[in-house]
């Protein structure tokens, strides 16, 4: 009986691995159809009970491979830029810039998956597919993100994405005015503003 149970467990693990691989491949195939993207977004923040606690808006720009930029405009300005190696976060309100290696922030910043084909990046997540929505969960127990959802159609049209934090708070980004213009790599280069506090986590 024990042998049969072990065999069943192995079969279930095998099926699970195949399902995960299929979901990752399908998501990557759809994302690969986006060479460049520029769009406005609206942000909806809800608490664990589903109550809306904040709204926002901004602009997102993507370029494959590995280039990502989000400029939040309301209710408070902030900027996230991934230049392929470093993830920059700029908060003008407190005049602070934080820099981390992309590799060190993957479990907490799944946005970079939108432009990444790096197998080591995807290996850090479990991916499930439900129609046009892909549910991405970090394997790391230390992650502050419980779940990252991407809704993207078969033809590569990115509709929205969202994060769910460990405390249940959800951040939904709905894209609109989507275009595919030529984007210069310089857009994804961060220049440190004068007079800001610079927290360089890459040196630690």
Curated annotation (Swiss-Prot):
Coiled coil: none annotated. CDD domains: LolA. Keywords: Chaperone, Periplasm, Protein transport, Signal, Transport. It is found in: Periplasm. It comes from the Bacteria. GO terms for biological process: lipoprotein localization to outer membrane; lipoprotein transport. The keyword Chaperone applies. GO terms for cellular component: outer membrane-bounded periplasmic space. Transmembrane segments: none annotated. Residues 1-21 form the signal peptide. Monomer. Belongs to the LolA family. Participates in the translocation of lipoproteins from the inner membrane to the outer membrane. Only forms a complex with a lipoprotein if the residue after the N-terminal Cys is not an aspartate (The Asp acts as a targeting signal to indicate that the lipoprotein should stay in the inner membrane). HAMAP family: LolA. This is Outer-membrane lipoprotein carrier protein. It comes from Histophilus somni (strain 129Pt) (Haemophilus somnus).
